[in-house]
Amino acid sequence: MEQDNKEQAMHQPPMDNKMLVPVSNVPVSSGNSGFHQPPATQYLPEMMRSYMASAEELRCNEREWESQLIRSLPEHGVRCPSQLAPIPFQNYCQRSIGRGSHVMPVGSSGTLGVTISFSENLMPQGGLPSSRGVSVMAHSSAPAMPYPMPPTVPATTGSLKHGILLVPGMASAGTHAVAPFMDQMLHSINPCNPEMLPARFQQLLPLDSQDSLVTESNTQEEPFVREPPTPAPEGAESPSTSRGATRRQSPVSRPYVCTYNSCGKSYTKRSHLVSHQRKHTGVKPFACDWNGCTWKFFRSDELGRHKRIHTRYRPHKCDECDREFMRSDHLRQHKRTHLPK
């Protein structure tokens, strides 16, 4: 019996860092507030092979979704979106892949199981790193929220020696994982050029946004051209012309018409017609009786103005310079000289 036990111990692989122990039994480093994950979600993975078999079945069923997720991950180290499964007291671990590192949640909504054996630090959200060499088998049933932004966990040093990560098998979890990458790709593309978008991303845009983008591009291509004013019809008249025609065609009674040699002029008063006909006949009945003056006039008002020359009578006087004038029109013309220039 003792020899069989020795041979079994020789063939058994070392379990220094790969030993599967509960998280609650791991000693906490100095200054750490403790690992406060509920004990109900921490299990000792003694049936690792059964979970690995279930993981292989899930990978076969969800191979298409996994390939899409792996292609979306960058080749060099970039932080994966930590909003895959927001759990209030969720633990994050730093996983080293190639030359980079990213942060992955240990437990998430819709995840059937996660089995990881590694020698690195565990970081609870808001706490200090725990000790190394821990194997965790976590099942979580916390509801997932759409794209929350928990605080980013600082990167810690360490290298992953051995680990198995089960990809979520539910379609809703896959949708939550792919949506952030789609949002980043949509934001990285210029929204003003809908032609640059791939066909699958153009289907994601709402119809009203596509219409607004097409309208904006059309308005940018076509320059603004001012339309010429519409010409008025030929028969139409301007308002000023129509008012003038109405004034000329006003129904004013002019019964007195001159018949001398088809003159055609008409007047409102008979006296005006008589004085007009004197111009045709040349008769000047109003003669000046001043001594030695032989002037004659057609009208009496003209004779009265003429006599002012002889008498020196000037009835129109300027208020500013006291100058006197025989006629009112002469006074108006004189007042223009006093206006400021």
From Swiss-Prot:
Its main location: nucleus. GO terms for cellular component: nucleus. Disulfide bonds: none annotated. Residues 238-252 have a biased composition (Polar residues). Gene3D superfamilies: Classic Zinc Finger. Residues 214-252 are annotated as: Disordered. PROSITE patterns: ZINC_FINGER_C2H2_1, ZINC_FINGER_C2H2_2. SUPFAM superfamilies: beta-beta-alpha zinc fingers. It holds the Pfam family zf-C2H2. A zinc finger (C2H2-type) spans 256-280, 286-310, 316-338. Keywords: Activator, DNA-binding, Metal-binding, Nucleus, Repeat, Repressor, Transcription, Transcription regulation, Zinc, Zinc-finger. It is found in: Nucleus. Exclusively expressed in testis and ovary. Localized to step 3-8 spermatids in testis and growing oocytes in ovary. Transcription repressor that binds to the promoter of target genes and prevents their expression. Acts as a negative regulator of epithelial-mesenchymal transition and metastasis in breast cancer. Specifically binds the 5'-CACCC-3' sequence in the promoter of ID1, a key metastasis regulator in breast cancer, and repress its expression. May be a germ cell-specific transcription factor that plays important roles in spermatid differentiation and oocyte development. Belongs to the Sp1 C2H2-type zinc-finger protein family. This is Krueppel-like factor 17. It comes from Mus musculus (Mouse). The gene is Klf17.
